[in-house]
Amino acid sequence: MMVTLKRTTSQDSDFNYLVTLLNKDLAEADGEILHAFYKQFNHTDKYNHIIVAYSDEKPIGCGAIKPFDDNTVEIKRMFVLQDERGKSVATKLLDALENWAKELGYFYCVLETGKKQKAAISFYTSYGYQRIPNYGQYKNIENSLCFKHNIK
């Protein structure tokens, strides 16, 4: 399988299609009430650094970075279609997002995922992300786990 990556912005229709599927996936995993709470933190209309993964011109995954502080970006909206998981698509996306963050002069990436997202937790820790205290809007949210990675 040949995977190609495209840098884009939040106006990209393929990205918005994948985010719709991600939201559906999370609503099923977390339940509607918890998903509705998290939705307020996931407005994608201002994202300028998005990567969409394709297989044979079909969008199969996405991820974004947004500034967190002067040295750090936050990884947002990481998602790979169910049928494409286990094929290194997420690794390619995360590699590309971290490389883009480096190009922009950042030193660290942070991210949040839910406690029920076992595959995501396993993926991020195997990639080198380490647990940190929950930050910002996730500070007192029991379902959230936050991670950080040094990319320099």
Q: Across the structure, where does each feature detected by a protein language model lie?
A:
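Acetyl-CoA-dependent GNAT
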Residues: V3-K76, L81-D83, L94-D95, N134-Q137, ...
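Conserved acetyl-CoA-binding loop-helix of GNAT-fold acetyltransferases
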Residues: V80, G86-N99, S126
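Ser/Thr-centric signal marking residues that sit
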Residues: C62, T91, T113
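Conserved catalytic-core motifs of GNAT/GCN5-like acyltransferases
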Residues: S10, L34, V110-K115, I121, ...
